[in-house]
Swiss-Prot record:
It is an enzyme of class 5 (isomerase). PANTHER family: METHYLTHIORIBOSE-1-PHOSPHATE ISOMERASE. It comes from Serratia proteamaculans (strain 568). This is Methylthioribose-1-phosphate isomerase. The gene is mtnA. Pathway: Amino-acid biosynthesis; L-methionine biosynthesis via salvage pathway; L-methionine from S-methyl-5-thio-alpha-D-ribose 1-phosphate: step 1/6. The record marks 148 as: Transition state stabilizer. The lineage of its organism: Bacteria, Pseudomonadati, Pseudomonadota, Gammaproteobacteria, Enterobacterales.
């Protein structure tokens, strides 16, 4: 396969390396990804994360395995194993569906390689288009709030919501970005803060519970988030805490935008209630672990509820920003999400 370099994925000498997002920002560690078992472990431990990136890493690994001569039957099983690794994010399912079609071709090895490379290039272009459409919604002097991480760390390109912030910043329209730390795994505090710093975008880090106070003071002009799955009625599954921000923004009459590629839309999912929500380990809530070490702050036997995602109802969303353009609440009420986009 051709060499590849993105913020979080490197392909060189027929080896796939992933940037360990659990080690950031203290350390920049590249980890090998030579087998399906390794990739599943990276996904489950969130070394690889972000809906688009998970799908791309799976596609690239499958193509590499095909080139190495792994039998077709084993690749078919690999598709099943990878599909089960992260149930909420639909990008993974969409990418695996396309790789499955490539595997069914008579010349399946080159077909899988070409499809994986096509998916990477498509994602880069999708990010650029999302940024262009979204930046048009950002007013000069804006103070924007974002949640979790939606930049180059989560995609092959400049990102989704962070891509919008970057494009608006390049246009001189961003005064400051408020970054939610995003408990319990701190993707905002660890990853988004790091990315914005690298990009030169002015930001301030806040605890999740501080967002309401900022909105009440008139310090937030709009909220920008990504998505892991968008249902046929416009409901959005995204990182836990997104729904809270949407409720707060609605109460304070602040625009709430979702930025995502069309591959995140799932017309076969009727509404948010039908989206499977991943439940994660209690240890993520009772303490914290990273390259800096581990710390347990709650009682060891404390009962914990730890969903990785929540669902934001379509009624709370001001606009869905896709690579194809901005979709309005009126269009959603008319059923635009009930058919495939793109």
């Amino acid at each position: 396969m051709q060499a590849l370099n993105t913020t979080s994925l490197t392909l060189s000498d027929n080896r796939l390396l992933i940037l360990d997002q659990q080690a950031l920002p203290q350390e920049k560690q590249w980890r090998s990804c030579d087998s399906v078992e390794e990739l599943v472990d990276h996904i489950l431990t969130l070394r690889v994360r972000g809906a688009p990136l998970i799908g791309l890493s799976a596609s690239l690994l499958l193509a590499l395995l095909a080139e190495r001569g792994v039998p077709r039957k084993e690749l078919e099983q690999a598709l099943i194993t990878l599909r089960a690794s992260r149930p909420t994010a639909v990008n993974l399912m969409n990418n695996l569906d396309r790789m499955k079609l490539a595997l069914a071709q008579p010349q399946w090895v080159p077909a899988m390689v070409e499809e994986a490379q096509r998916l990477v290039e498509e994602d880069r272009k999708l990010c650029d288009r999302i940024a262009d459409h979204g930046a048009g919604l950002v007013k000069p002097g804006s103070r924007l709030l974002t949640h979790c991480n939606t930049g180059g760390l989560a995609t092959a390109g400049i990102g989704t919501a962070i891509g919008v912030l970057l494009r608006a910043h390049q246009q001189g329209k961003v005064q400051q970005v408020w970054v939610d730390e995003t408990r319990p795994l701190l993707q905002g505090g660890r990853l988004t803060a790091w990315e914005l710093g690298e990009l030169g975008i002015p930001y301030r880090l806040i605890c999740d519970s501080m967002a309401a106070s900022l909105m009440a003071q008139g310090q937030v002009d709009a909220v920008w988030v990504g998505a892991d799955r968008i249902a046929a009625n416009g409901d959005v599954a995204n990182k836990i805490g997104t729904y809270s921000l949407a409720v707060l923004a609605h109460y304070h009459r602040i625009p709430f935008y979702v930025a995502a590629p069309h591959t995140t839309h799932d017309p076969h999912c009727p509404n948010g209630a039908a989206i499977a929500i991943e439940q994660r380990a209690a240890v993520e809530v009772t303490g914290v672990t990273g390259s800096f070490g581990s710390c347990q702050w709650a009682p060891v036997d404390a009962p914990v509820y730890n969903p990785a995602f929540d669902v934001t109802p379509a009624a709370l969303i001001s606009g869905w920003v896709f690579d194809s353009g901005v979709i309005t609440p009126q269009q959603v009420s008319e059923g635009i999400f009930q058919r495939a986009l793109g």
